[in-house]
């Protein structure tokens, strides 16, 4: 059995590239809508392993409201990233246009981590 998450976002073509840049991922499967302007389904992999799926949201959320309210209804946890530099890199990309909830640093349960709601309204906890 395998499990990974899927996000529904506005601007799915841009979001896929954004997440590839943040995590060193690559698009391994992609199905565009009829006019080629959005993903009906897209899968990202890191080192050959499925990491994240995404698709264009049919009813996108108000990301500005998510940022203003600092909503954390669900968090995607990416951990064992291998180094503080990997966490800093992902944090730098994910925080572009996003809302930082916790900057990179230690917590009692992890020596180096951060939490950010990205510009698509997705909350990420990233850790070494």
Name every feature range the model reports, one short phrase each:
Residues 120:
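Active-site His/Glu-centered metal-binding helix of metallohydrolases
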């Amino acid at each position: 059995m395998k499990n990974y998450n899927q996000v529904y976002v506005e601007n799915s073509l841009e979001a896929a590239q954004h997440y590839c840049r943040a995590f060193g991922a690559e698009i391994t499967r992609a199905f565009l809508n009829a006019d080629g302007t959005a993903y009906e389904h897209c899968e990202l992999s890191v080192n050959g392993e499925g990491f994240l799926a995404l698709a264009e949201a049919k009813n996108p959320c108000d990301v500005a409201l998510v940022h203003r309210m600092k909503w954390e209804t669900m968090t995607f946890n990416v951990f064992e990233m291998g180094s503080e530099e990997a966490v800093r890199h992902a944090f730098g990309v994910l925080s572009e246009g996003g809302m930082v909830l916790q900057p990179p640093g230690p917590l009692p349960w992890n020596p180096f981590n951060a939490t950010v709601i990205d510009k698509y309204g997705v909350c990420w906890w990233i850790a070494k």
